[in-house]
Amino acid sequence: MVTQVGINGFGRIGRIVLRASLSNPEVQVVAINDPFIPLEYMVYMFKYDSVHGRFQGTVEAKDGKLVVNGKEISVFSERDPAQIPWGSVEAAYVVESTGVFTSIDAASAHLQGGAKKVIISAPSGDAPMFVCGVNLEKYTSDLKVISNASCTTNCLAPLAKVINDNFGIVEGLMTTVHATTATQKTVDGPSNKDWRGGRGAGANIIPSSTGAAKAVGKVIPELNGKLTGMAFRVPTPDVSVVDLTVRLEKGATYEEIKAVIKKASENELKGILGYTNDQVVSTDFVGDAQSSIFDAAAGIALNDKFVKLVSWYDNEFGYSNRVIDLLAYAAKVDAAAQ
């Protein structure tokens, strides 16, 4: 069964979700909506990418449609999600990747146009959040709007789950050293809600807030209230790294911690949580489809109950692959429930 998908918002995540969908035979993107990007420009934006390189397939505009690898994708340009005719192209599942419609109420507008399910590619204040490898078993087919959480939560949660399951986490602090994103300014500019966030992205390390660590408590209830965190935005275009410092319930050597993470990466979390012993740097992970790659050589332990763990993630590509994985999983559960 191939699940037909619509994408609302053809920005960084929307475009990379389309790229990711091409390597999953269970999913086919049949429509894209973006009121700000004309069709010819869509072709250009999809073909060329400063981070992920030139698209290694064919892309063209033909008869008002975007044609990728010979397959036609309908293009809409509605500003109001309720007006997008998803039903006319049988796009049952919609990826909401504008970054604007992130609540259940706002994202539900897609249902009026014929969509059956909406996956928000961002954290949500009220939509249930799912992280592949962590809490997918809690998904039920009656849910109409769900969230794939954030790229940072997708990196942190699998690591936190392994540590908590094996040793117990008493409490912890997370810092993500995070690549620049589209909401930042190229040079100093106005940003009333976040003064630091208005400073030039290319010239600064910018302290910022993130709800990623607290969100782990929503997908792993046992960790609710035990983790919080912050971010440093840095002048790199892609790939971020989580620094998780935790106090453990059960003492363990760093070697023992590495062993359980390696085991999980080869078994139940294969493809989600990676493991490396190499002397890696951020660009080594551009295009890595995993949610989180544990850097065994970078972590440190003060004693057997207080450790710092380091894990990398391609905040664009890894996350976009999980959006597709979550969607495909939901479609299977929904089909079985019918």
Swiss-Prot record:
Membrane-spanning residues: none
Name by which UniProt lists this protein: Glyceraldehyde-3-phosphate dehydrogenase 2
Residues under site feature: Activates thiol group during catalysis: 178
Record Gene3D superfamilies: Dihydrodipicolinate Reductase, domain 2 (3.30.360.10), NAD(P)-binding Rossmann-like Domain (3.40.50.720)
CDD domains named among the record's database cross-references: GAPDH_I_C, GAPDH_I_N
GO biological process, one term: glucose metabolic process
Family indicated by similarity: Belongs to the glyceraldehyde-3-phosphate dehydrogenase family.
Catalytic site positions: 151 (nucleophile)
Subcellular localization: Cytoplasm
Keywords per UniProt: Cytoplasm, Glycolysis, NAD, Oxidoreductase
A single Gene Ontology CC term: cytosol
Binding site for D-glyceraldehyde 3-phosphate: 150-152, 181, 210-211, 233
Pathway: Carbohydrate degradation; glycolysis; pyruvate from D-glyceraldehyde 3-phosphate: step 1/5
